[in-house]
């Protein structure tokens, strides 16, 4: 697929580069990561030259990142031509096969670079791995908290490098990851296992390893959700969380990972729809707060990269202003990109009118557009080769990625209770498996030589899978029914390890922090003694004596 890229020369004029999928010379090959520009002077000069060619409407468009429609570029052509968006975000309904996504990405970039100023798109996705994973193909890694239990930055790097390779192969150049939130609230309904840990230093270390690997792979990394979403008991998708903690506590708990990532040069920071009154703004959520975005993030932390809002279709940011006003206030607060506005036309028109009327100065608009252009230049978007469908399919089935996912899962399994040494089970044992993930756990145990029975009576042990049992009476009753059989009960917690606080009397308790198949296989390997548990608790468990760093081994 031939693709045109308009690039400025340093004198301020433009040249038209022609790259093909199979050309000679210096043109990149399909799927190849392009050379990223590292000289800040070159980036600044080229960004300024591009900006000078853009119309006001094109500048405003760069701030918009709508949701994609359908599974083809053609279905989004009108949005590109009318609004000149800075990017799009993929969701599962847009993603079918590697070949289809590669073709869609190529088509979107062709449309964008052939329209107006010819600025390539950020094509993003929420691919945190684990619970928040959009790709229906490729290796499925465990959640971030599994990495927190494994305590190995190299495993975090492997996860991010594999993810970046999978994304780049299908033309996705931005990942809304990693989560830099410090999960200190056991009742957090939206973060939980998406967080590495309750320990700020460990969160920062693992998030930094992921950021470096994403960006080394040519994929934009996004630290989220500033100023911190780890101490909420309200989901900002459905309401506005209020975190009433002091500035001192915030600096001690929530700030360190973000400061570390800012210092490390993270490409992008995502704001949170949370209200933190003691940080200096009791009226607006962080996404709409000039004090928190411009004052704290930019001026105090020294961040000059791209700031994106969290999705603007979430209730946490829509409770006090209409959707057009939300978009305007986010820009005034210091945001550069408006993610998923519920009405693209309304957001575009509101920001454009605010600039035309002088409420948003054109200088302020230019600041955001320059940040966006600089990042697109640094990550090589202007000379990116088209995604190659055949290569994309190969990357999606790459065995090295699946092996890495299993290594992460194996290293994360945390044994928190083992009464009378019930684990490991003998390979001759008969086991009944029920609850969350029973089919996959049972199959893995059978593969290891244990006999898996459909009958609860007569089993040598009962394995019960849970996920969120702390807040689910039905799961608690299921464990009680297993205990009533008289056989030893082994719980495999596949969400947060907080389930142990409501299951204090089980014989053995394993935390695997993920419902991914590799985590269920890892649990079976530990139950059968194939692997010795080496994970350590990355959080404290309320109502128990178990806390950060605890974990048993064989």
Regions found by a protein language model. Name each.
Residues 79-98, 176, 186-187, 262-283, ...:
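Short acidic, glycine-rich surface-loop motifs adjacent to enzyme active sites
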Residues 69-72, 94-97, 127-132, 174, ...:
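Solvent-exposed loop/turn segments at secondary-structure junctions
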Residues 145-172, 179-211, 398, 504, ...:
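A substrate-binding/cap region within the structured catalytic cores of diverse enzymes
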Residues 121-160:
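Substrate-binding cleft of extracellular glycoside hydrolase catalytic domains
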Residues 4-5, 16, 22-83, 299-300, ...:
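Preference for extracellular/luminal or secreted protein segments
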Residues 1-11:
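Bacterial N-terminal signal peptides that target proteins for export
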Residues 55, 75, 96-117, 131-133, ...:
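Second-shell residues forming the walls of enzyme active-site clefts
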Residues 61-68, 86-90, 121-127, 174-178, ...:
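Hydrophobic faces of well-ordered beta-strands that scaffold small-molecule active sites
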